[in-house]
Design a protein with these regions (language model features):
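Aromatic "clamp/platform" in nucleotide-sugar-dependent glycosyltransferases that forms part
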Residues: 289
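Carbohydrate-associated surface elements
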Residues: 148, 169
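Short hydrophobic beta-strand element within catalytic cores of glycosyltransferases
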Residues: 306-309, 319, 325-326
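Nucleotide-activated donor-binding/catalytic signature segment of Leloir-type glycosyltransferases, i.e.
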Residues: 110, 246-272
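Acidic anion/phosphate-binding donor-loop and adjacent secondary structure
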Residues: 129-131, 154, 170-185, 195
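A charged, aromatic-enriched C-terminal amphipathic alpha-helix characteristic of glycosyltransferases
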Residues: 346-352, 362-392
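N-terminal subdomain of nucleotide-sugar transferases
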Residues: 1-53, 87, 387, 411-413
Length: 413
């Protein structure tokens, strides 16, 4: 008997992007019982690539079926029609910002007459986004990545039949603690020195990540250290310093903080290298003014690395008093664009950031993280839990799907 097929739309699962990594885990889990087709953002639009053999090896499923249909962005209605017609899809799974799928939601009546839509969704902050109500109602099921997302969706579409809290999960076989000897060696190899205190930020260089506030906050902390202690601290930022939609990090450091010990890692790295980076860090920080979830800090927890977070969005879900320093927002205001008319932004003050860094710096050797695995498991923050929950939701979605009745117009005389 032939398996049912799932069409996944999002970043190419072979690319090391945040969405790509998550969709890879989900799709490999689903491939155990479904045939998978991905409309893969970032591929040439003429490409159709069969990766069934490599998926079979990865999952030990000799019957795996997995094809990639290329798209330069996030697909089109014509491409989806072609894929559904060719592959006979049983469900569609989408993941990324809702505005990427305007073309899909505008044609939801047509698409949902053929198969249901599952949206793995995150929203950064209040107010409840009423302008997304038509999008939420266009989906047959919505998996909410944070508790705040779940709160937003359920308050916008109060009678939606299937909205479930389904947090991101970390693969603890890819992100795990290393021993002190390896950490010391990695610091020497990667940083050029076995620093006593490494503050690490892994973030895309876009405005909401507030990297300029981070540098200012680190400066507040650094200037209060003794001359001797200054020699043994460093801020490591993994980002693109010249990203067109971000801040000019090089100019900020050259002109404003030329004496500040900051290292930039600007090359895309695979998960084993990222695991090294979390482990060599004394602390991982995320003070974004909008953050739907914040994978970097949860990945850090999986390596037994303490975290500093802004008390906003999905970062709230990750707070554990044993190993988290929380920076409370100093200002909350409304900002927006044409696509996102309104959303709260929670800004932290550099002095508060500096104070939190200093607090963790002083207590770092006394922090105990022996219960980190229990924390991940109890909060469903493991990749296994994420994939299992989404797989169950897809099963239920397909089982309960009923094709809408088609109406026929007759001439009335």
């Amino acid at each position: 008997m032939q398996n049912k097929k799932i069409v996944i739309i999002g970043d190419d699962i072979r690319q090391p992007t945040g969405v790509g990594n998550i969709l890879r885990a989900i799709s490999l889990e689903l491939s155990q019982k479904y045939d998978i087709v991905q409309i893969a953002a970032g591929l040439d639009s003429s490409e159709v690539i069969d990766i069934s053999e490599s998926v079979s090896k990865a999952t030990k499923n000799p019957k795996a079926y997995f094809k990639l249909y290329g798209t330069s962005e996030y697909g089109s209605l014509d491409l989806l029609r072609s894929v559904i017609r060719t592959e006979s899809a049983s469900a569609i799974l989408i993941m990324t910002d809702p505005h990427r799928f305007n073309w899909l939601f505008e044609a939801e009546h047509e698409v949902r007459s053929l198969c249901p839509i599952y949206y793995y969704h995150v929203w950064d902050n209040t107010p409840y986004p009423k302008f997304l109500s038509s999008i939420y109602n266009s989906c047959d099921a919505i998996g909410c990545i944070s508790k705040l997302t779940h709160e937003c969706v359920t308050n916008v579409v109060t009678d939606h039949p299937c909205v479930k809290y389904t947090p991101h999960g970390i693969n603890t076989k890819k992100f795990y603690p290393q021993d002190d000897k390896m950490i010391s060696q990695n610091r020497k190899d990667f940083l050029g020195k076995d620093y006593e205190f490494v503050l690490f930020c892994n973030a895309t260089n876009i405005q909401r990540k507030e990297l300029s506030i981070l540098m200012s906050g680190f400066n507040e902390f650094y200037n209060k250290l003794s001359k001797k202690n200054k020699e043994d601290v460093v801020l490591l930022i993994h980002t693109n310093p010249t990203a067109p939609n971000g801040v000019n990090i090089n100019s900020i450091l050259d002109d404003l903080y030329s004496d500040l010990p900051v290292l930039i890692s600007d090359e895309m790295v695979l998960e084993p290298i990222l695991n090294n980076m979390y482990n060599l860090s004394s602390c991982v920080i995320n003070i974004a003014s909008n953050e739907g979830f914040g994978l970097s800090t949860l990945e850090a927890v999986a390596t037994k690395t303490p975290i500093i977070v802004n008390n906003t969005g999905g970062l709230k879900d990750q707070i554990n008093e044993d190993w988290t320093e929380v920076v409370e927002p100093s200002v909350t205001c409304i900002r927006g664009t044409q696509q996102t008319p309104y959303i709260h932004a929670d800004y932290v003050d550099p002095k508060s950031v500096g104070k939190s860094i200093n607090t963790l710096y002083k207590r770092r050797k006394n922090i105990k993280m022996d219960s980190y695995l229990d924390f991940l498991r109890d909060n469903n923050f493991t990749e296994e839990s994420m994939c299992s929950n989404i797989s169950s939701q897809i099963d239920e979605l397909i089982y309960n799907y009923k094709q809408p009745e088609r109406f026929r117009f007759s001439k009335i005389t």
